[in-house]
Each structure stands twice: as structure tokens, then as C-alpha cells.
């Protein structure tokens, strides 16, 4: 008899469904199941913003200390023990709240994920600026969902500026909504760029500027790709380009730019290895850039002019 009662209770909800009635399903389960992508993005944006600002304030307190300097790809590619400390702080903070997400960091930390969410983290973007107490360094935290950039947060501690973005939230700086520049003429464009850490590319980049400078308003070199992209997103510069970036350099900035009404594109060399007939694509994921890619960001009405300028400037990093 107890078994028959047990079976009846299990079959009864099914009978209700078959009779056209809906069982009262656990409401918590329904809410979890029906969580919209916007809600997920907002949760991730809030978390990324908190992480960037919390870590950035701690990093700023270490300014002026004697740091252990090492180099990576070249003597100009600096890393300090604070970069590594910041990376550890951020990854521990993320994993404590989102243990199933994938995490990829500049200084080598990699945590394999179990879902469709991936974090790209630059613990200090613009380390040389940090070493010199120059304000152009930042903490950069980007998030992809289903291999598409969705969320970003960049915090510049010495300027106390927190940029954050998601598709449902737009892009803000310290809570104020921002958007890309309305400049639509290349000759009026202020363009930011960065230089390679590799000496063999720096000469080429200097030569490229000879063909670029006469056709634009001016060039700015601030020393950190993340903050450069934040500057595009809020209209402080009209465009940005740089060769040889990595996913963690641009992930957060990508979210800022596209949710501020801008666009990011990637110029890849042709199969023969040159840029005379390059492949030019709209960037969907920061994973789509490679060692020889040129990343370009601006407003949608200026992007084609910037890309054409770069191609016509005889760029060659082979």
C-alpha cells in the first residue's frame, strides 16, 4: 500500500498535464530556468565592475614602492610582482562567485570552464605607466557569452574612472552614459595608437605614421590599449588602432566601444602574409585576433575611412 500511494503522487502531476492543467512547478526552478540573457549580463557587469574597482584601488596603494621588474617578450615589455598579485586577487574573486566560468589572464593564469562564459583579464594594462606612476594604467575585465563579447569593465585608479558596459546597460563612465565621437571626417580625427614591444616592429610602425599623420588631426599614444579603447567609447579620441594585441588587451574595451555605438574591426594579413589585400572583419570575439592582427576601433561612420587609411599606408609587419 505505501508503494501504491508513492506511485500515485508521482503520476498525479502527469495526469494534470494530460488533462490540460499545469502542475505548480517550483517557482525558484522556473526563475532560474527563465533567467534572461539581459539579467545574466547585468549580473556579470556588476561583478566585473566591482572586481576592477576593488582591485584597482588596492593596486594604486602600491604606487611608489620598489618593485621587482622583469620582462617578457622584450626589455620594454615590463611585468611586476603587482601584476601577478593583482591577477591572483581577481581570479580568486571571480572563482569564489562563479566557479564554473573559464578564465584567461595576461600573466598566465588559466582556469578551464564548464559553461559558455569566459573571462579575459588584464590585471594591469599599461604596466610601464604603473611603474612610472603615470595615470594611463588600468584594470581590464572582459566577459564573453557564447563566444561573443558582452560585458566589460575598465578602472583607471589614478583618474578614479570606472567604465562599464553591457548590451542592456550601454556604456557608462562613473555611472554617466557615454558614446563614441560623432566625427565623420578623417581629417578631423584624433587617433590613438600603441607601439609594439618588439624592436623589429617599432621601426615599421614609425614609418607607417609618416603616411598616416598628414591625413588626420593628430596621433595620441597613451600606453595602454584598454584605456585607449575606453577613450574611444567616451569620445575622447575618435579612433584607435594597434598591431599585435592579445585578447585580454581588448576584451573589456571591445564591450565598451560597441555598447557606446562604435565598432571594432580586425585587419589580418592575406594568406601570403602581407597586408596588400588583407582580410577585414567585424570583431565579435576578442579570441578572433592573432599575433599579426591590427585591431581598429571607432564610430561606425568613421571606421571604413580608418581601415582604408591603414591599408593604404603600406603597413607591413612581415
Residue ranges and their predicted role:
Residues 20-21, 25-124, 307-318:
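N-terminal subdomain of lithium-sensitive/metallo-dependent phosphomonoesterases centered on the IMPase/IPPase/PAP
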Residues 4-6, 27:
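Serine residues within intrinsically disordered or low-complexity segments
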Residues 113-172, 187:
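DPxDG-like acidic metal-binding loop motif
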Residues 59, 83, 94, 127, ...:
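Residue-level signal for inorganic ion chemistry
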Residues 179-318:
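An extended, acidic
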Residues 65, 137, 165-169, 258, ...:
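A short, compositionally biased
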Amino acid at each position: 500500500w505505501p508503494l501504491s500511494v508513492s506511485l500515485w503522487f508521482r503520476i498525479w502531476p502527469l495526469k494534470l498535464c494530460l488533462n490540460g492543467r499545469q502542475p505548480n512547478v517550483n517557482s525558484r526552478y522556473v526563475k532560474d530556468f527563465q533567467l534572461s540573457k539581459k539579467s545574466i549580463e547585468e549580473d556579470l557587469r556588476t561583478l566585473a565592475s566591482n572586481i576592477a574597482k576593488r582591485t584597482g584601488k588596492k593596486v594604486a596603494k602600491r604606487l611608489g614602492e620598489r618593485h621587482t621588474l622583469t620582462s617578457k617578450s622584450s626589455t620594454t615589455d615590463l611585468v611586476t610582482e603587482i601584476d601577478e598579485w593583482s591577477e591572483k586577487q581577481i581570479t580568486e574573486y571571480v572563482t569564489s562567485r562563479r566557479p564554473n566560468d573559464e578564465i584567461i589572464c595576461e600573466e598566465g593564469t588559466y582556469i578551464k570552464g564548464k559553461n559558455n562564459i569566459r573571462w579575459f583579464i588584464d590585471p594591469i594594462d599599461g604596466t610601464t605607466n604603473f611603474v612610472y606612476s603615470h595615470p594611463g594604467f588600468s584594470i581590464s575585465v572582459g566577459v564573453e557569452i557564447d563566444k561573443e563579447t558582452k560585458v566589460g569593465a575598465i578602472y583607471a585608479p589614478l583618474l578614479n574612472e570606472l567604465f562599464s558596459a553591457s548590451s542592456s546597460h550601454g556604456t557608462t563612465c562613473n555611472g554617466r552614459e557615454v558614446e563614441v565621437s560623432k566625427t565623420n571626417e578623417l581629417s578631423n580625427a584624433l587617433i590613438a595608437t600603441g607601439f609594439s614591444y618588439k624592436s623589429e616592429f617599432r621601426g615599421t610602425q614609425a614609418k607607417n605614421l609618416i603616411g598616416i599623420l598628414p591625413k588626420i588631426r593628430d596621433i595620441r599614444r597613451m600606453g595602454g590599449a584598454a584605456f585607449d579603447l575606453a577613450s574611444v567609447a567616451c569620445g575622447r579620441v575618435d579612433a584607435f588602432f594597434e598591431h599585435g594585441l592579445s585578447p585580454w588587451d581588448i576584451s573589456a574595451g571591445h564591450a565598451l566601444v560597441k555598447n557606446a555605438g562604435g565598432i571594432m574591426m580586425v585587419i589580418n594579413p592575406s594568406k601570403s602574409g602581407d597586408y596588400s589585400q588583407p582580410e577585414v572583419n567585424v570583431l565579435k570575439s576578442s579570441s578572433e585576433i592573432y599575433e599579426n592582427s591590427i585591431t581598429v576601433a571607432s564610430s561606425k561612420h568613421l571606421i571604413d575611412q580608418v581601415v582604408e587609411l591603414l591599408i593604404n599606408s603600406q603597413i607591413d609587419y612581415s
